[in-house]
């Protein structure tokens, strides 16, 4: 099985999602052909048992799309796993992958919690929801959660129309 994980940053200063990816890759990479796609950073973490690929950021939209599509065609993954939300690059990589009929797993890493959604609601969340985020959540084949209360929050927001 081949899996591509997209994560906006694997920099040491990026926090929990980067640490999660590092731990996950060390074990998952023993079982599958694992590729991690991110953007260049000044201080990336070392991630074992996988191939790390760097693509341009959203600021270079055309280059980002071209390199993402190239990687998809070269690797031909069974699953594309998007590890984030609220960022245009995440929604775009998902959209481009789904246009080529790849299966998508979207892991928001707690970013659908009510307190996160309320933070910068009018300036960031509403525009993101209207432009791409709600559609990305609905179109993912799965939205994994690890805690019961988080699962309830995400299910309520995603499927009740309150997102």
Predicted regions and their residues:
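A short, charged, and often flexible helix/loop element on the N-terminal side
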Residues: 45-71, 75, 79-86, 115-123
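An aromatic- and histidine-rich active-site surface loop
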Residues: 79-114, 131
């Amino acid at each position: 099985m081949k899996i591509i994980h997209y994560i906006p940053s694997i920099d040491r200063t990026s926090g929990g999602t980067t640490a999660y990816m590092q731990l996950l890759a060390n074990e998952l990479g023993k079982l599958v052909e694992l590729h991690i796609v991110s953007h260049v950073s000044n201080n990336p973490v070392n991630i074992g048992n996988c191939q790390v690929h760097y693509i341009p950021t959203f600021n270079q939209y055309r280059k980002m799309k071209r390199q993402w599509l190239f990687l998809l065609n070269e690797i031909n993954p069974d699953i594309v796993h998007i590890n984030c939300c609220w960022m245009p690059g995440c929604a775009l990589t998902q959209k481009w992958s789904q246009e080529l009929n790849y299966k998508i797993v979207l892991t928001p890493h707690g970013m659908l919690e009510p307190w996160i959604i309320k933070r910068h609601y009018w300036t960031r969340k509403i525009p993101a929801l209207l432009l791409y985020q709600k559609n990305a959540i609905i179109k993912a084949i799965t939205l994994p959660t690890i805690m019961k209360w988080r699962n309830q929050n995400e299910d309520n927001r995603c499927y009740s129309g309150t997102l």
